[in-house]
Amino acid sequence: MKLIKNIQIYAPENLGVKDVLISDSKIEKIDNHIELSYPIETIDGTGCILTPGLIDRHVHITGGGGEAGFISRARPIDVQEILDAGITTVIGLLGTDGYTRSTKELFAKAKELTQKGVHTYILTGSYAYPSNTLTSSVEDDIVFIDSILGVKLALSDHRSSHITEDELIHLASRIRTASLIAGKQANLTIHMGDEKQALELVFKAIEKADIPISLFQPTHCSRNPHLFEEAKRFTDMGGTIDITCDGNGKTLSYIQQIQNTEKVTISSDAQGSWSTYNEDGSVKEIGITPISNLKKEFIYLKNEFGYENALPFFTKNVANVLGFKRIGQVKEGFDCDLVIWKEDQIQKVITKK
């Protein structure tokens, strides 16, 4: 058990200065003043702020990259890097390289991170179609593997499989059915590239098939102006979009253009590669994205419009669109995924471990 005394809570909403009792990895009680008749570990929160742990829904936990040959493969992420960024939940996935990287490797890494105290889930698939899987099918992965929350796919990208409208509908239908059977809120996380068709296939699939728009969740939606305009239209229709941050606050200008901000999440694309290409298609430049970008982006947004308005993009919104019932908020009965801040510095990360 732990007792945090006299701490300002943003849950994300402002709860004021409270005491928080943690028991069995859960938030047992939040009250103005908590006194116990027996001694337990007590943390003095005076002058500090308590928030939910951040959720990063786009992390290449086994390492991404590879577009510039084997030398460009990124290393797997370390658990301490995640915790140092104030992140207590991650979604691991594959990217361009679904050939030398595997879903089995992803699953094993997720188990490692979970055992070290970070909630870790994964997506099956990669950029390619048909999807590479852990079991014999996308459906079996979602139904039988608790940690698998959906499928990854690339669209409108020169590295994608350039699937057809019917293939997209077929894949989405399979995810939908498996999601219902598993009792999950499974989704199709769609890596969006720079090609001019942008979200065209997604719009066509939604129009043609009776599949909930919530199943389609495009990411990297600020990649270019045309894509972002289509992403805004997508949110107006009730869809969820994810914006990749760079740690320099660029997401702010995009968020300010969106009406339905509850359907917007921000992620890092950590341990994935960023790359630019020459006219002949060869790699011009490549680098690896650090997970610390998420914390930096949160601090930037928090300093612009406060904890209450900044936190949801990194916590509550993410939990809601992914179907997490007990994380993403500082609330009685929720998991004790918490971060203690003093100004812009993390003082302590508390997880289930």
What is each of the regions a protein language model found here?
Residues T96-F107, K116-I211, P225:
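Buried, small/hydrophobic-residue-enriched core segments of structured protein domains
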Residues I7, S25, G47, H58, ...:
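Divalent metal-coordination and catalytic microenvironments
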Residues G53-R57, V90-G92, T120-T124, L149-L155, ...:
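Hydrophobic faces of well-ordered beta-strands that scaffold small-molecule active sites
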Residues G45-A108:
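Metal-associated gating/positioning segment near the N- to mid-region
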Residues N260-W341:
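His/Asp/Glu-enriched, well-ordered alpha-helical/loop segment
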Residues R174-Y277, V283-K284:
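Active-site core of metal-dependent hydrolases
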Residues I7-I9, K18, D24-I27, I327-K353:
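C-terminal cap of metal-dependent C-N hydrolases
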Residues M1-S37:
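N-terminal metal-binding scaffold of metallo-dependent hydrolase/deaminase domains
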